[in-house]
Amino acid sequence: MRRRKAPVREVLPDPIYGNKVITKFINSLMYDGKKSVATEIMYGALKAIEKKGGDVKGIDVFNDAIENVKPILEVKSRRVGGATYQVPVEVRPVRQQALAIRWLITYARKRSERTMIDKLANELLDAANSKGASFKKKEDTYKMAEANKAFAHYRW
C-alpha cells in the first residue's frame, strides 16, 4: 500500500458546456493521447442526440445517462477462513461517476452502429431512458449485491 493518499487532481471544465464531467468523459474516451479525436466524438454525439431528440438538449440527456448508470451497491471479494465471500458495499460518489463513465464508453464501443459518434449517441439515449447495455450492467451489479446481502456483516 502507498504511504500517502495520492492527491486528487482537478480537471478543467470543458470549453463549450463548462462541465467537469464532460471533461472526465472525454479523457476516458481518449486513445493514445488523441484528445482532439475524443473531443470531436463527444461533441458530435451530443449534437447527434439534439438532432434525433428534437427539443431535448444533448447535455441534459448526458446528465440523465450518467445519473441512471451510477451504481449504488457493488460487491467486493473478502476472504474469511478459506472461503471467499462476495460482500456488498456502498459505492463512493467519485467511484460511482467513474464506473458510470467507464460502462457507458465500454458498451458504446461494443454497439453495432457505423461510427463511434452514433454508437455513443445511441448508448447515451438508451441510458437516459433506462435501457441499454450500460444500464443493464448497473442493474446486474445491484442484483449481485442484493443476492449476497447475507454477507453484509463482513463489511470492513
From Swiss-Prot:
The family database entries (InterPro entries) matched by this protein are listed as: Ribosomal_uS7 (IPR000235), Ribosomal_uS7_bac/org-type (IPR005717), Ribosomal_uS7_CS (IPR020606), Ribosomal_uS7_dom (IPR023798), Ribosomal_uS7_dom_sf (IPR036823)
Q: Which UniProt keywords apply?
A: Ribonucleoprotein, Ribosomal protein, RNA-binding, rRNA-binding, tRNA-binding
Query: Is Ribonucleoprotein there in the keyword field?
Result: yes
- Classification via PROSITE patterns: RIBOSOMAL_S7
Q: Which GO terms describe its biological process?
A: translation
State the Gene Ontology terms under molecular function.
rRNA binding; structural constituent of ribosome; tRNA binding
- One Pfam match, given by its short name, reads Ribosomal_S7
Does the keyword tRNA-binding feature in the UniProt annotation?
yes
Q: Which family does it belong to?
A: Belongs to the universal ribosomal protein uS7 family.
Q: How does it assemble?
A: Part of the 30S ribosomal subunit. Contacts proteins S9 and S11.
Job of this protein: One of the primary rRNA binding proteins, it binds directly to 16S rRNA where it nucleates assembly of the head domain of the 30S subunit. Is located at the subunit interface close to the decoding center, probably blocks exit of the E-site tRNA.
Q: What name has this protein been given in UniProt?
A: Small ribosomal subunit protein uS7
Native organism is Campylobacter curvus (strain 525.92)
